[in-house]
Amino acid sequence: MNKKKRVLTGDRPTGKLHLGHWVGSIKNRLDLQNNPAYDCFFIIADLHTLTTRVRKEQVVDVDNHIYEVLADWLSVGIDPNKSSIYLQSAIPEIYELHLLFSMLISVNRIMGIPSLKEMAKNASIEEGGLSLGLMGYPVLQSADILLAKAQLVPVGKDNEAHIELTRDIARNFNRLYGEIFPEPETLQGELTSLVGIDGQGKMSKSANNAIYLSDDDATIEDKVRRMYTDPNRIHASTPGRVEGNPLFIYHDIFNPNKEEVEEFKTRYRQGCIKDVEIKTRLAEELIRFLQPFREKRAELLAHPKILQEALQKGTENMCALAKETMEEVHNTLELSRKWRSRLSL
């Protein structure tokens, strides 16, 4: 019988999750979780949060954000009985493996990763102000992946370079000390991102262009009403552009009535329909889609013990796996092995 392939993915706890997370990662995670060929590990990467959020009030907020992420995950169907959900900072071995891996990769190699500068820009970090922690973010990510001996990592195109770095680190370690780590492969879903409601790049909290999984009906209606469409379409009788229009991107994803969507597109191109009619239907479909998630989320937040137990169970699973991996690393590396055995600590 073939052994299950181990999958690792997760989120930084920076707040509530939004439709961009659903489209870019969560839907794919559910498919993987419910496929018997995969063994899924989902990491709440709180240490990664510190790479761009180091102020005291930001660090204090992480605790609450962990509850937010947990509630969102479980409300959409992530199942702690099928997958291991764990807290990154609760795994001591991650710190050690991160340090060891940092000896195996050059600064030039790290600085060649395109997304690093983008992260600094999004965090309003000026050039030259990059912290050692942020610069080492991709190495910490490699430690997450290889500590779990993950074989598959679902990522967007902007993170493919991170996985290539992880493969480089695995190859370097295996060549120098012995074969321990698999070289993980990337796994991409049909869609890796969702344009924000302002039409200016992908949906994100920092851009203030997100519809959250927990938004109430009135908030959804308001955000859809303000959604960016074709700027050249001043009147309903003006033929509009469908391609690249956020309004139709969302309809294609969230409106199950494909005949209706195609009719909207035809009438829009002909200048025979008002934006408000299309937006009203989109709001209705988003409300229908998100309502069960929102209700389940509220129930979970009202019973935090369920969230705690889910995280406890998964973190214990990851702790056991981490200990096994690091025992292999210590035996292979033979770092001060004789002295370590003599010390009674």
From Swiss-Prot:
Homodimer. ATP binds at residues 12-14, 20-21, 156-158, 194, 202-206. Its EC number is 6.1.1.2. It is found in: Cytoplasm. This is Tryptophan--tRNA ligase. Belongs to the class-I aminoacyl-tRNA synthetase family. GO terms for molecular function: ATP binding; tryptophan-tRNA ligase activity. InterPro entries: aa-tRNA-synth_Ic (IPR002305), Rossmann-like_a/b/a_fold (IPR014729), Trp-tRNA-ligase (IPR002306), Trp-tRNA-ligase_bac-type (IPR024109), Trp-tRNA_synthetase (IPR050203). Keywords: Aminoacyl-tRNA synthetase, ATP-binding, Cytoplasm, Ligase, Nucleotide-binding, Protein biosynthesis. It comes from the Bacteria. The keyword Zinc-finger does not apply. Its main location: cytoplasm. It catalyses: tRNA(Trp) + L-tryptophan + ATP = L-tryptophyl-tRNA(Trp) + AMP + diphosphate + H(+). Catalyzes the attachment of tryptophan to tRNA(Trp). One of its GO terms (cellular component) is cytosol. A motif ('HIGH' region) lies at residues 13-21. The lineage of its organism: Bacteria, Pseudomonadati, Chlamydiota, Chlamydiia, Chlamydiales. L-tryptophan binds at residue 144. The gene is trpS. It holds the Pfam family tRNA-synt_1b. It is an enzyme of class 6 (ligase). A motif ('KMSKS' region) lies at residues 202-206. Disulfide bonds: none annotated. One of its GO terms (biological process) is tryptophanyl-tRNA aminoacylation.
